[in-house]
């Protein structure tokens, strides 16, 4: 590329950085609102298992990670067409920030419940909001990280998100019998019996 082409490429990238910062705030708000609504989607659908594959089917910590994952991934798709095409680390930055956000929910939840001995709804909401904010903040940081400026990093990022979504779908119907997947309300795992109606059987 010529010097002029490099110059314009740099200008476009810098403008995209600014757009990323502004869009991330919108993404944060979208994720908090959409995540809050998704909490009720499975019950509102009457226990539709297709809906349950992408929304919480019980009150376990694992299932509630969908409240961050699904809106964040959906908004990332929008961001890609708004400004992401111009950023060489877009997919790597997005996937890494989402993974850290999910880990933050788990760590913050078990840390505070370990200290106080139980969970509180207000604190759970706070954990979700803080983790969502962390996700979008880190996205703005990572998108400027030269270490992620490679096709390999982006491919790994896309693969990681795809794998984790597949894992969430699989564990919706076949959850491991461990604390992360246990519904503290029913002391059970997976889809509650009152909702369990397989799409394959129905169809």
Model-found features: residue ranges?
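Short aromatic-rich membrane-water interface segments that cap or initiate transmembrane helices
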Residues: 53-66, 190-203
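Final/C-terminal transmembrane alpha-helix of multipass membrane proteins
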Residues: 155-175
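N-terminal membrane topogenic signal
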Residues: 14-27
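Small-polar-interrupted transmembrane alpha-helices in polytopic inner-membrane proteins
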Residues: 35, 39, 75, 79, ...
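Hydrophobic cores of alpha-helical transmembrane segments in multi-pass inner/ER membrane proteins
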Residues: 66-79, 129-141
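Alpha-helical transmembrane segments of multi-pass membrane proteins
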Residues: 30-47, 169-174
């Amino acid at each position: 590329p010529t010097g002029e082409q490099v110059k314009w490429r740099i200008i476009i990238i810098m403008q995209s950085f600014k757009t990323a910062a502004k869009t991330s705030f919108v993404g944060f708000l979208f994720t908090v609102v959409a995540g809050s609504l998704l909490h009720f989607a499975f019950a509102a659908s009457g226990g539709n298992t297709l809906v349950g594959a992408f929304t919480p089917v019980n009150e376990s910590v694992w299932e509630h990670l969908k409240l961050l994952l699904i809106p964040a991934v959906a908004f990332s798709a929008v961001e890609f067409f708004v400004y992401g095409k111009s950023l060489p680390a877009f997919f790597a930055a997005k996937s890494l920030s989402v993974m850290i956000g999910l880990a933050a929910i788990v760590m913050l939840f078990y840390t505070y419940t370990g200290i106080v001995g139980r969970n509180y709804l207000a604190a759970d909401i706070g954990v979700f909001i803080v983790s969502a904010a962390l996700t979008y903040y880190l996205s703005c940081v990572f998108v400027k990280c030269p270490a992620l400026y490679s096709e390999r990093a982006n491919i790994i990022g896309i693969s990681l998100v795809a794998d984790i979504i597949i894992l969430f779908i699989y564990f919706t119907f076949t959850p491991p019998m461990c604390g992360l997947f246990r519904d503290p309300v029913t002391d059970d795992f997976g889809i509650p019996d009152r909702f369990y109606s397989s799409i394959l059987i129905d169809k």
